[in-house]
């Protein structure tokens, strides 16, 4: 009997080793390709992942849609994509990008770290997929081709770029009376630079590679009021990775958040000061109220996850309990 147990143990160990001996293919969305920052960070991550029993083979994608589709059909064992694109795999974490939900770095870091803790692990798995890391690309700012567009009212009638796969953005544009123009990561910069659109939301990291200064010209500006944080998701097919990999990965990614935000701050400081435009406090409040109303409507419409909206409100109100929304209970 003892001999049989030993044989079974050795056999099961060999099977486990064989199962994870193959490399896990991770598809990395980076609009620049293999020479981009996202792919460089993924290479650093791949070295760390060896400590958790994974051997990652990285594949660069310049088209995020294809990366997500390849994850669905099993060509990728994991994919690093934006939270907007990742919402189809996990609505809870995919709602992190909700408009106005996380508008400053400190609140965002706290939210991401809480979501990466073991206490939140049950929300990270949906079907065969697991969120193995929550990162950020940075705040989304409005790039406008005319700095006279400094209030919500003045955005009425303007052509505003919206990502066609995000149901929320067209509704927001409609709310301010703008004209939604469908864009994707590959052509948003070109459409702004060629004056096909007047306004485009984008992170600071897009300023140089997409040459957005061309669209800004002499009259344009970047509104220094973040609409949201653009999250990055590492989504894996759970059964293709060693047991416990997801939590180890989330913990490590969360430990790098301060470093990540430091890099983002450097990108922002590298943008010439002449392009930044501050808006008055009363107009900031108008933005916050408009975005809050939009979040509530979009949650009722089933686009945002209500549990995530409630969680993010708690995080915001812990940071700033005097905020007007903290006395309200409809979100």
What are these regions (language model features)?
Residues 7-16:
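Bacterial N-terminal signal peptides
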Residues 17-21:
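Sec/Tat signal peptide C-region and signal peptidase I cleavage site
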Residues 22-52, 130-194:
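Bilobed "Venus flytrap"/periplasmic-binding protein-like clamshell domains
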Residues 26-107:
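Extracytoplasmic small-molecule ligand-binding "clamshell" domains
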Residues 71-81, 159, 179, 194-202:
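Alpha-to-beta junction loops
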Residues 83-93, 189-194, 199-225:
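A ligand-binding cleft/hinge motif common to bilobed small-molecule-binding domains
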């Amino acid at each position: 009997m003892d001999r049989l147990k030993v044989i079974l143990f050795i056999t099961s160990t060999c099977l486990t080793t064989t199962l994870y001996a193959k490399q896990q293919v991770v598809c990395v969305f980076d609009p620049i390709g293999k020479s981009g920052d996202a792919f460089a960070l993924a290479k650093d991550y791949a070295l760390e992942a060896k400590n958790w029993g994974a051997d990652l083979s990285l594949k660069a994608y310049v088209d995020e849609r294809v990366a997500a589709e390849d994850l669905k059909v099993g060509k990728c064992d994991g994919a690093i994509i934006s939270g907007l694109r990742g919402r189809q795999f996990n609505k809870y974490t995919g709602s992190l990008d909700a408009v106005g939900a996380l508008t400053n770095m400190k609140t965002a870091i706290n939210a991401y770290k809480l979501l990466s803790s073991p206490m939140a692990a049950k929300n990270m798995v949906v079907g065969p997929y697991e969120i193995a890391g929550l990162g950020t690309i940075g705040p989304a700012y409005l790039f406008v081709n005319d700095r006279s567009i400094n209030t919500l009212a003045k955005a009425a009638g303007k052509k505003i770029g919206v990502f066609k796969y995000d149901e929320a953005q067209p509704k927001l544009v409609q709310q301010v009376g703008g004209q939604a123009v469908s864009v994707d990561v590959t052509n948003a910069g070109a459409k702004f630079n060629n004056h096909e659109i007047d306004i485009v939301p984008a992170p600071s990291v897009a300023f140089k590679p997409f040459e957005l200064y061309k669209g800004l010209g002499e009259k344009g500006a970047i509104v220094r009021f973040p609409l949201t944080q653009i999250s990055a998701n590492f989504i894996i097919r759970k059964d293709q990775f060693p047991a416990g990999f997801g939590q180890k990965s989330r913990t490590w990614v969360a430990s790098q958040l301060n470093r990540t935000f430091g890099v983002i701050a450097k990108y922002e400081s590298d943008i010439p000061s002449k392009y930044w435009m501050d808006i008055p406090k009363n107009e900031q409040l108008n933005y916050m109220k408009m975005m809050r109303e939009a979040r509530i409507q979009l949650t009722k419409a089933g686009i945002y996850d209500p549990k995530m909206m409630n969680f993010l409100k708690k995080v915001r109100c812990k940071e700033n309990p005097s905020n007007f929304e903290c006395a309200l209970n409809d979100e």
